[in-house]
Regions:
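Signature aromatic-anchored transmembrane alpha helix within multi-pass, membrane-resident enzymes
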Residues: 335-375
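Short helix- or helix-capping micro-motifs
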Residues: 25, 116-121, 169, 173
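Hydrophobic/aromatic-rich transmembrane helices and adjacent perimembrane loops
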Residues: 129-130, 136, 299-346
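Transmembrane-lumen/periplasm boundary regions of multi-pass, lipid-linked membrane glycan transferases
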Residues: 31-36, 46-56, 76-78, 178-284, ...
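Membrane-interface transmembrane helices that cradle and orient dolichyl/undecaprenyl
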Residues: 105-111, 143-163, 171-172
Length: 393
């Protein structure tokens, strides 16, 4: 009996719940991907006409991973269709979701793993990011660095973990905003990474250096030919407008928690990106994380939040893709804290524990239902959405 079969038999209930959740989430991500809005948005059409070949992508390498994947899929599906760019976004969003799920599996038990992933994946905020035919979903990929750095510290397969980390950094650097996360990770975990790399042969390290050099060469060449590419990568505007930046900074919490600016791409009317329950869990999660601020995971979550705020201040984006992961990490922390506090009050009462778990599960499912119906029913039938999504590819 191999080790995977043995692990499944020992903890089969956990795996069944996880597999069922995966099937449901895949269904949500792919449901009516091309037909929900009927036509495309102007921004989707503009991006669709950008970098239509790999040669053009080399000349303009911003968000290159998105365009390479999209163009490769387009070669397989000859008729021009809005499904192709949207499916490409879904693929990267699925990668974000996998990393989010994996990080939660390192930090929490099965109950919070399932509830936290469902809360994140069913969010209308996440669905708008994941299913729009724009490369915005890639800006949430910073959580991959969290996952890979944790894996590197724990695994015995140092070469494989190092290779995955190097490849990830090489591709993430093409995505606007990711350079801040990479630099922050190097400054914070540089000594720990050096210690991890000490167990790897110099030949393999040299190979990794050559590999990442090859991957980033098109980007370096593009920056050399056109220095403005660097501004786009970092988010720095060509002309600094302090008043505009302060306005962006002020609008971030307003848009997430209170009242969003009407935009058919990201929301219905002026509804905020978060619901009341998730907002409350976020506040509790910030408190809980502050209580455990010495833990690496607390520092990571606050670091992701800070860099998300920095980039979202520099760049106008109604979807705030770099904010969603840290916000939901705090929300999951809040849900976990609530359950832990309840369990501390009734440490030996299985009935009380069962009631608490059931109530929280019902709340999370209710929130998921609200967001799913909001995205799949209310949003596409909204007048502003219909007028905005009226372009043909």
């Amino acid at each position: 009996m191999n080790k995977y079969k043995k692990a499944f038999l020992i903890d089969w209930k956990r795996y069944i719940v996880i597999m069922f959740s995966v099937v449901v989430i895949i269904g949500i991500l792919l449901f009516q991907l091309g037909r929900l809005t009927g036509q495309a948005n102007k921004a989707e059409v503009s991006v669709y006409k950008t970098n239509v070949s790999h040669r053009e992508t080399v000349r303009n390498p911003i968000n290159a991973p998105y365009y390479v994947v999209r163009n490769s899929i387009q070669k397989l599906i000859k008729p021009q269709n809005i499904v192709v760019p949207r499916f490409t976004s879904v693929l990267f969003a699925a990668l974000v979701l996998f990393a989010f799920f994996s990080v939660l599996s390192l930090w929490y038990e099965t109950r919070m793993l399932v509830l936290g992933t469902l809360l994140f994946a069913s969010s209308s905020w996440f669905l708008h990011i994941a299913r729009i035919g724009l490369p915005v979903s890639m800006q949430s990929l910073g959580i991959i660095l969290v996952l890979l750095s944790a894996w590197l510290h724990q695994t015995k397969k140092l070469k494989l973990a190092t290779l995955c980390l190097i490849l990830s950094i090489g591709f993430l650097v093409y995505i606007p905003g990711m350079i801040w996360l990479i630099l922050a990770a190097i400054l914070w975990k540089g000594k720990a990474l050096k210690k991890d790399f000490s167990g790897i042969s110099k030949k393999f390290i040299l190979f990794c250096i050559c590999l990442i050099s090859i991957i980033v060469t098109p980007l370096l060449w593009a920056v050399f030919k056109n220095p403005s590419v660097l501004f786009e990568l970092t988010g720095f505007p060509n002309t600094l407008n302090i008043q505009h930046l302060l306005s962006n900074l002020y609008n971030i919490p307003i848009q997430i928690f209170i009242r969003a600016t009407p935009n058919s791409i990201s929301n219905i009317g002026n509804l905020p990106l978060l619901d009341v329950f998730t907002t409350a869990m976020f506040v509790i999660g910030v408190y809980a994380t502050m209580q455990a601020r010495k833990l690496d995971r607390s520092k990571l979550t606050f670091g992701l939040l800070f860099i998300g705020i920095l980039f979202s201040t520099l760049v106008d984006s109604p979807l705030l893709p770099m904010m969603i992961v840290p916000v939901y990490l705090f929300a999951v922390s809040g849900v976990s804290f609530m359950l832990d506090e309840w369990f501390n009050v009734f440490p030996r009462n299985p009935l009380a524990k069962g009631i608490a778990t059931t109530l929280i599960s019902i709340l999370v499912l209710s929130v998921a239902y609200y967001h799913i119906t909001s995205y799949f029913i209310a949003w596409p039938n909204n007048t502003d959405t219909k007028s905005s999504f009226s372009e043909r590819i």
